């Protein structure tokens, strides 16, 4: 009996120990409280699915480039389309993270400039992450509109920040002449492309050009300033002035091929280094150049991540070592709806993004409207900052503290934005919301680690700044299709303008009727509604693309992998007003 009791007691102790170990092992797992049978969840899921459907429709349209006739004209010359070229350039089966696919969306009225006339993104070539810029000659002859320049420069900025080799697939007629005032003369116009090339080359970031079509006027400097350049026989041309301008200026009549073709530049001028017989050969040569860059190939994201770009290439398989989230990413549709007045717990979003849905929260009981903590993303430690309401002083102080920790430990930061702004009012001001908010903004601005931002809801006012908006140089910034971005909400802006007008009328001894107020408010609300749209934002490159919420984990993983080529430097903070 005694022995039996001892065995029973021992078994109980062992059982309790196992339960405790299991509990401790799962202590940082986020447990979802989402009710998938609730009316709100189902309504959100329907509405978000509709928004994602719209996104897919818009994306499918831009993939058509300049339209069927332009595509037929282009391919009849034996030329591949821009995205086909990228597909052949990249390692087979590897993902391509296309950026700003909807740049230029409805930006020029009846002029359709799909993808801004240029395809940019990050992909893997011979085991090395590279930044690819490919002109789409089916869109206005590949000419540079203002948005084309902006998108090209943004791609180079990403390459420089993350130390990614640049591969330019050139097929462009140069600057769009009718819009030359917005393309040519200013600091961040066309000339900055070549400035960036020169400086990146000086920093040891390889610059490779593949001339697969026209390369005219200033555009001729893309291959001329590249570390190595390739040109395609009887297809690629490079000249500062084309045949019409040469004839007008000198009276000389010359063909494009004789003026600047592959034979001239490979055999006589020396502008190009490699002679390609066709597009496929040129892309093979480009891969050979990358293979000889003498860069240590990192663990490619092809080995770590499932493909989720906007280009439908083959799917890459993630390794078994990576712990997938415990919850289905498509549940995000039901958690976050288009009605931004309805609150949700950002932890439910985090649980569907990070490895194993594991999240070690920082200062959980303090400043509860800001959620901060550590997690793994494809095996890499990241710090996550997510909104759960308006930012109070306590929230801002907590955020500043956490960002400092990540900067000190060189841990990348992920910001999940759904923010109406900082708290306002007499009590908030008395409690120092201005200086405490400034601490968080300072921390975000100075933290010299890779930062990534996803706008999952609202992005309003100074809250955009505190949560690493575009002005704070996140390495990549994405938006969900339900998101909104404005200095404030349309209704609030309309009420402010109406109040100012009413006060002005009163001082002048005049009345301001309710009818007049409504007449004033309506166009303001309409304007803010239009300009707050994620499509308005992405058309102007205020972000790096609108993404399907269900792909957030994969896209952040691809972005993180690219950024780890330059994991950041020592952080120095300025003065924090105490």
From Swiss-Prot:
Expressed in third instar larval ring gland (lateral and medial secretory cells and corpus cardiacum cells) and CNS. Coiled coil: none annotated. Residues 321-570 form the CoA carboxyltransferase C-terminal domain. Pathway: Amino-acid degradation; L-leucine degradation; (S)-3-hydroxy-3-methylglutaryl-CoA from 3-isovaleryl-CoA: step 2/3. It is found in: Mitochondrion matrix. Residues 48-305 form the CoA carboxyltransferase N-terminal domain. Residues 1-29 form a transit peptide. Residues 48-570 are annotated as: Carboxyltransferase. Keywords: ATP-binding, Ligase, Mitochondrion, Nucleotide-binding, Transit peptide. GO terms for molecular function: ATP binding; methylcrotonoyl-CoA carboxylase activity. Its EC number is 6.4.1.4. Carboxyltransferase subunit of the 3-methylcrotonyl-CoA carboxylase, an enzyme that catalyzes the conversion of 3-methylcrotonyl-CoA to 3-methylglutaconyl-CoA, a critical step for leucine and isovaleric acid catabolism. Vital for adult survival. This is Probable methylcrotonoyl-CoA carboxylase beta chain, mitochondrial. It comes from Drosophila melanogaster. The gene is Mccc2.
């Amino acid at each position: 009996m005694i022995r039996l009791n001892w065995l029973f007691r021992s078994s109980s102790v062992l059982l309790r120990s196992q339960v405790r170990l299991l509990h401790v092992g799962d202590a940082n797992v986020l447990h979802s409280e989402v009710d998938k049978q609730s009316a709100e969840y189902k309504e959100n899921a329907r509405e978000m699915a509709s928004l994602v459907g719209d996104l897919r429709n818009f994306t499918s349209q831009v993939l058509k480039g300049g339209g069927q006739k332009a595509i037929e004209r282009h391919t009849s010359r034996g030329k591949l389309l821009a995205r086909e070229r990228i597909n052949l350039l990249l390692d087979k089966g590897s993902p391509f993270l296309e950026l700003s696919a909807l740049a230029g969306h409805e930006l020029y009225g009846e002029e359709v400039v799909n993808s801004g006339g240029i395809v940019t993104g990050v992909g893997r070539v011979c085991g090395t992450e590279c930044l690819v810029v490919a002109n789409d000659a089916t869109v206005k002859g590949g000419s540079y509109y203002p948005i084309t320049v902006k998108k090209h420069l943004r791609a180079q900025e990403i390459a420089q920040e993350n130390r990614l080799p640049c591969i330019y697939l050139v097929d462009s007629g140069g600057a769009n002449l009718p819009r030359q005032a917005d393309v040519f003369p200013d600091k961040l116009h066309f000339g900055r492309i070549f400035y960036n090339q020169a400086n990146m080359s000086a920093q040891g970031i390889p610059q490779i050009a593949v001339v697969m079509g026209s390369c005219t006027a200033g555009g001729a400097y893309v291959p001329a300033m590249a570390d190595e350049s390739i040109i395609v026989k009887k297809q690629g041309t490079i000249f500062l002035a084309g045949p019409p301008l040469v004839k007008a200026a000198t009276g000389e009549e010359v063909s494009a091929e004789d003026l600047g073709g592959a034979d001239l530049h490979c055999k006589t001028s020396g502008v190009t280094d490699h002679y390609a017989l066709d597009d496929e050969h040129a892309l093979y040569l480009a891969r050979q150049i990358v293979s000889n860059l003498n860069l240590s190939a990192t663990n490619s994201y092809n080995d770590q991540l499932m493909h989720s770009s906007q280009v439908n290439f083959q799917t890459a398989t993630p390794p078994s070592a990576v712990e997938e989230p415990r919850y289905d990413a498509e549940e995000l549709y039901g958690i976050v709806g288009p009605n931004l007045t309805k609150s949700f717990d950002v932890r439910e979003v985090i649980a569907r993004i990070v490895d194993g849905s594991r999240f070690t929260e920082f200062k959980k009981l303090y400043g509860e409207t800001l959620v901060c903590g550590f997690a793994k993303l494809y095996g890499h430690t990241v710090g996550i900052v997510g909104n759960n309401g308006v930012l109070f002083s306590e929230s801002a102080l907590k955020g500043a503290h956490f960002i400092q920790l990540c900067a000190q430990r060189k841990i990348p930061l992920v910001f999940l934005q759904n923010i109406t702004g900082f708290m306002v009012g007499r009590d908030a001001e008395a409690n120092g919301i201005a200086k405490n908010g400034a601490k968080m903004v300072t921390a975000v601005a100075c933290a010299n680690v890779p930062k990534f931002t996803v706008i999952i809801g609202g992005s309003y006012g100074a809250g955009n700044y505190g949560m690493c908006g575009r002005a704070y140089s996140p390495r990549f910034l994405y938006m969900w299709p339900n998101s909104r971005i404005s200095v404030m909400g349309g209704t609030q802006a309309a009420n402010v303008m109406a109040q100012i007008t009413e006060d002005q009328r009163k001082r002048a001894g005049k009345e301001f009727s309710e009818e007049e107020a409504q007449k004033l408010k309506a166009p303001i609300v309409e304007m803010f509604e239009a300009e707050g749209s994620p499509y308005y934002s992405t058309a102007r490159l205020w972000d790096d693309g609108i993404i399907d919420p269900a792909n957030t984990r994969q896209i952040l993983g691809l972005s993180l992998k690219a950024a780890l080529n330059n994991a950041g430097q020592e952080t120095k903070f300025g003065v924090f007003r105490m």
